[in-house]
């Protein structure tokens, strides 16, 4: 591990993946990191499946996915990993749903999505899988909400989202699923909505104050954060084209309102298409794209207690468009784009005792 200004954090570098990829689907189950599908050097979706044994730090090849895909969603259900939606070799959204049985090392097909979709957001609650939104073969954003019942191997429809979108950020908090942002075609969505799992009703919350694509979102200590991104031109914006920003907007779930933090509390670097997560009372922003000609390697954290940004140790491998996954005190940053699809697997970790 390496340390720097952020003494509470360090990077752990794992052996590189056998297959370089971007838009891979990742899951963590029983101390194994699974990386499924994605796009390789040729730019086409892969059926390749690999797993990293966290104890031995060795990679193993798994049985290939029945359906090659990129940008799929994954949910862990006990000893199974369910893979939902994504895009296929002809750049068309897929309806296929497949489960990898960890103990048996094989794939099984499951009930397909009612409609093919890419950019589906998924949440697991009490053994049920909720799939929200997506983009269909007609490129139109979807408002559908479906719930998968593993025992019956079927999808059931729930009340639709008020705002159709794909690629949204979702957070489970209490008995509600919060859905933030996403896209409609090339346009970023500012909607912020919540689905009550008990009442099965939707609530519209105040929209994001600013319209940004490729922003990073995280939830911590009862607040939702929206960071950075590409700011879109608008009537109160003198820029004629999208530009990188270091904006920080925070929604207080208790008070139900957004706060746009002042310049002194913005991120140190302007960035988009980056990894964001919550570790040990900090919101962390990792890599991405900025005004430089190559991906960023810088990392920073916002201390919720001290209300300030601090520089953290830089990424060992600067990248953007990474897959990410949080498992305990580790935030994994997997694959992505450096000078092409990357094999790098690294994790930002909390030091022991912090």
From Swiss-Prot:
Keywords: Cell cycle, Cell division, Cytoplasm, Kelch repeat, Repeat
Subcellular location: Cytoplasm; Midbody
Main location as per UniProt: cytoplasm
Gene3D superfamilies: Kelch-type beta propeller
Kelch repeats: 1-31, 32-79, 81-127, 128-175, 176-222, 224-281, 282-329, 331-354
Gene Ontology CC, one term: intercellular bridge
Database matches in Pfam families: Kelch_1, Kelch_KLHDC2_KLHL20_DRC7
BP GO terms, sorted: mitotic cytokinetic process; mitotic nuclear division; nuclear chromosome segregation
Function according to Swiss-Prot or TrEMBL: Involved in pinching off the separated nuclei at the cleavage furrow and in cytokinesis. Required for mitotic integrity and maintenance of chromosomal stability. Protects cells against mitotic errors, centrosomal amplification, micronucleus formation and aneuploidy. Plays a key role of midbody function involving abscission of the daughter cells during cytokinesis and appropriate chromosomal and nuclear segregation into the daughter cells.
UniProt protein name: Kelch domain-containing protein 8B
Native organism: Pongo abelii (Sumatran orangutan)
């Amino acid at each position: 591990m390496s340390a720097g200004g952020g003494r509470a954090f360090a990077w752990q570098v794992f052996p590189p993946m056998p297959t370089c990829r971007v838009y891979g689907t990742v899951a963590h189950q029983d101390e194994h990191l699974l990386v499924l599908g994605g796009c390789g050097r040729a730019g086409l979706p892969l059926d390749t499946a690999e797993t990293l044994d966290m104890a031995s730090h060795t990679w193993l090849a798994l049985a290939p996915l029945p359906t090659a895909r990129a940008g799929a969603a994954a949910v862990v259900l006990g000893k199974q990993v369910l893979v939902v939606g994504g895009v296929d070799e002809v750049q068309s959204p897929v309806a296929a749903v497949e489960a990898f049985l960890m103990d048996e090392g094989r794939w099984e097909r499951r009930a397909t999505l009612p409609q093919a979709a890419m950019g589906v957001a998924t949440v697991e609650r009490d053994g049920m899988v909720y799939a929200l939104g997506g983009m269909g073969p007609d490129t139109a954003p979807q408002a559908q909400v479906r719930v998968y019942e593993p025992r019956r191997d079927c999808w059931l429809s729930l009340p639709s989202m008020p705002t159709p979108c794909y690629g949204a950020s979702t957070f489970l908090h209490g008995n509600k699923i919060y859905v933030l942002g996403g896209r409609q075609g090339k346009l970023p969505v500012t909607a912020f909505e919540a689905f009550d799992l008990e009442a099965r009703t939707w609530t519209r919350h105040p929209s994001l104050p600013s319209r940004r694509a490729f922003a990073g979102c995280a939830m911590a200590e009862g607040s939702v954060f929206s960071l950075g991104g590409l700011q879109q031109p608008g009537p109160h914006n003198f820029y004629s084209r999208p530009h990188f920003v270091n904006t920080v907007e925070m929604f207080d779930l208790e008070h139900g309102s957004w706060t746009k933090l002042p310049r002194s509390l913005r991120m140190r670097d302007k960035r988009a298409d980056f990894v964001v997560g919550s570790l040990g009372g900090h919101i962390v922003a990792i890599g991405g794209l900025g005004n430089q000609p190559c991906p960023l390697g810088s990392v920073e954290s916002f201390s919720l207690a001290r209300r300030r940004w601090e520089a953290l140790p830089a990424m060992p491998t600067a990248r953007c468009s990474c897959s990410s996954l949080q498992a305990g005190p580790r935030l994994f940053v997997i694959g992505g784009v450096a000078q092409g699809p990357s094999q790098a697997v690294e994790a930002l970790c909390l030091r022991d005792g912090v």
